[in-house]
């Protein structure tokens, strides 16, 4: 398998074989510098070889090797139709995995034009070129397409946690049992693919619009993967932010009334490769198992980081409601986007769909582990 991450266009992609089954098929990965693109390349390199099933609906063992090219924005601007056409003409891809996205949730409230250009127009232009060329498109979306429902139980539970913390005067950083239980029976069920989206923010609306544009062009041939609370060893994400703050700040306030599920980028990458290898289409949800609040996530990050000597001393972690956090931000002149109070995704459809073609992709079934286990796997790589 050939993996290339470069600013230089290749002069040729796949002309080394005379038999159709052995001619490598090209996979383009957009947003090469994103944490997901890096995870896709890392997983592919660890596996050593990827291959398409030439007939995903049968038991045939015929496979086609893949060549991977990860393209940065300077190499492939997904909002530029002319640039896209030139890149497709040069590489002639069989698959495109779109990791390029505008992910600045708060900034999008004041930059809706750019958010929609990248998150909606870009996927649409990619889909149009895929339709013209016969390539397949896998587009990555977000749990933030959901969240329009009011979840009073979460707010009430969060208020109780905050009040208890204030009354006790305890900064919760040493005992994980002090973290609130975000899995009471009265919480909503995780979202499935057929649930109606109802985004709250400009970012969420732009991601939903991107999905709709892709499906409008490709119909049933589109592959869309929604994920949540993505983190990894590379890039800007909640885990790296918390670790940096825990090394420099005496205490932290973390939101307690937004419930979701953290997802390790490497696990998502493994799932994406399985979808590509099996040439699956449809809308799928993927996250780790379980659910938590940002506050619980922060407490668990610190607990594990201390155990792995990634942190030398604990810091105080105090729960705060979204309303209070927003007020504090406004007092500092910062406007925050609305976020869903509950955006847990059900991965059941995806899990039942996938049939492992390469055992190396999931030797320990980490894709279906609890979020705490996935977090531990990632943090151990940093220790």
Regions found by a protein language model. Name each.
Residues 25-46:
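N-terminal Rossmann NAD(P)H-binding glycine-rich loop of SDR-like oxidoreductase domains
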Residues 117, 122-125, 145, 150-225, ...:
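Catalytic helix-loop patch of NAD(P)-dependent Rossmann-fold dehydrogenases
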Residues 212-260, 266-267:
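NAD(P)-dependent short-chain dehydrogenase/reductase
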Residues 110-138:
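NAD(P)-cofactor binding segment of oxidoreductase domains
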Residues 69-79:
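Rossmann-fold cofactor-recognition segment
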Residues 2-7, 361-383:
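Amphipathic terminal alpha-helices
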Residues 81-118:
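NAD(P)H-binding glycine-rich loop region in Rossmannoid oxidoreductase-like domains
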Residues 35, 39, 271, 278-335, ...:
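Mid/C-terminal beta-alpha module of Rossmann-like enzyme folds, strongest
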């Amino acid at each position: 398998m050939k993996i290339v991450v470069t600013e230089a266009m290749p002069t040729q992609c796949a002309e080394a074989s005379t038999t159709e089954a052995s001619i490598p098929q090209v996979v383009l990965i957009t947003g090469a510098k994103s944490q997901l693109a890096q995870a896709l390349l890392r997983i592919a390199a660890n596996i050593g070889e990827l291959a398409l099933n030439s007939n995903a609906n049968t038991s045939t063992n015929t496979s086609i090797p893949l060549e991977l090219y990860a393209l940065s924005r300077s190499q492939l601007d997904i909002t530029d139709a002319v640039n896209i056409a030139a890149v497709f003409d040069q590489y002639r891809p069989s698959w495109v995995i779109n990791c390029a996205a505008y992910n600045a949730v708060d900034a999008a409230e004041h930059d809706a034009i750019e958010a929609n250009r990248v998150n909606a127009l870009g996927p649409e232009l990619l889909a149009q070129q895929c339709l013209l060329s016969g390539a397949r498109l896998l587009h990555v979306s977000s749990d933030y397409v959901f969240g329009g429902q009011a979840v009073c139980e979460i707010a009430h539970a969060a208020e109780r946690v905050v009040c208890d913390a204030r009354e006790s005067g305890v900064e919760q950083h040493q005992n994980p049992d002090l973290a609130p239980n975000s899995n009471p029976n009265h919480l909503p069920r995780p979202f499935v693919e057929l649930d109606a989206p109802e985004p709250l923010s400009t970012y969420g609306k732009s991601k939903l619009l991107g999905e709709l544009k892709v499906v409008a062009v490709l119909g049933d041939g589109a592959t869309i993967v929604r994920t949540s609370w993505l983190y990894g060893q590379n890039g800007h994400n909640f885990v790296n932010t918390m670790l940096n703050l825990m090394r420099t700040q005496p205490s932290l306030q973390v939101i307690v009334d937004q419930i979701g599920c953290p997802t390790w980028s490497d696990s998502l990458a493994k799932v994406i490769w399985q979808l590509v290898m099996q040439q699956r289409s449809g809308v799928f949800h993927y996250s780790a198992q379980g659910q938590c609040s940002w506050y619980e996530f922060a407490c668990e990050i610190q607990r594990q980081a201390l155990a792995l000597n990634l942190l030398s001393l604990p810091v105080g972690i105090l729960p705060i409601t979204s309303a209070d956090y927003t007020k504090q931000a406004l007092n500092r002149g910062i406007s925050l986007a609305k976020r869903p109070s509950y955006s847990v995704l059900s991965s059941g459809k995806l899990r039942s769909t996938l049939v492992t073609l390469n055992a190396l992709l999931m030797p320990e079934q980490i894709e279906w582990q609890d979020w705490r286990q996935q977090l531990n796997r990632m943090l151990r790589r940093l220790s």
